[in-house]
């Protein structure tokens, strides 16, 4: 599994090197997919049958990573447009990107909420608390993009969001 993921990342790097400015192909979605698979890969490889709770976990990671990447594209819209980079925002527009982010946030909250109906696992509570915190921080970055654009704070905060699960693991399991 790891070799397949590594090969897909290698193909991505070759692809963006040769085609990056020519055509938009959805790199944000691909990167979010690779991120979510990479996080879950050790568990996927370890177990025979993937339980529904792991699928919920993966979908939530994918949505959060997608929000993060499209949010960065939206904030960097003018710079990317000027430099000729293709991104979701430069192809679809900053306003459309904002709408997609809001739809993804709404979908995340629906999936997050429904997990409490379908899963009774106590361990789920810790992860769900971190996930809703991550989504809340990303929503805050979206709402304060003008202020956070200065000194690129949006990027620092947006990247730190993905460190929160590690902090949670250290605190709870450490």
Specify the residue positions occupied by each region the protein language model found.
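Membrane-helix boundary/juxtamembrane motif in polytopic membrane proteins
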Residues: 25-26, 84-99, 121-126, 153
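Helix-coil boundary and interhelical linker segments in multi-pass alpha-helical membrane proteins
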Residues: 1, 39-59, 113-126, 170-174
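Intramembrane alpha-helical segments
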Residues: 1-44, 141
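Solvent-exposed interhelical
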Residues: 64-106
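Small-residue-rich segments of transmembrane alpha-helices in multi-pass membrane proteins
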Residues: 28-44, 90-96, 156-169
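Hydrophobic transmembrane helix bundles of membrane-integrated enzymes that assemble
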Residues: 59-67, 103-115, 165
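Transmembrane helix-loop-helix
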Residues: 1-17, 100-152
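Functional transmembrane core segments of multi-pass inner-membrane proteins
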Residues: 28-72, 77
């Amino acid at each position: 599994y790891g070799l397949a993921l590594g090969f897909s990342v290698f193909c991505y790097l070759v692809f963006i090197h040769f085609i990056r400015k020519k055509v938009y192909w959805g790199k944000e979605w691909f990167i979010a997919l690779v991120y979510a698979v990479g996080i879950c890969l050790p568990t996927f490889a370890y177990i025979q049958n993937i339980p529904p709770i792991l699928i919920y976990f993966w979908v939530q990671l994918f949505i959060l990573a997608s929000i993060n990447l499209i949010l960065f594209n939206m904030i960097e819209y003018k710079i990317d447009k000027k430099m000729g980079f293709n991104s979701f925002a430069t192809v679809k527009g900053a306003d459309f990107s904002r709408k997609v982010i809001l739809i993804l946030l709404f979908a995340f909250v629906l999936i997050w909420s429904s997990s409490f109906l379908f899963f009774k696992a106590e361990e789920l509570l810790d992860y769900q608390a971190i996930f809703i915190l991550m989504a809340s921080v990303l929503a805050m970055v979206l709402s304060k993009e003008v202020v956070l654009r200065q000194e690129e704070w949006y990027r620092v905060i947006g990247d730190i969001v993905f460190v929160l699960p590690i902090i949670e693991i250290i605190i709870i399991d450490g």
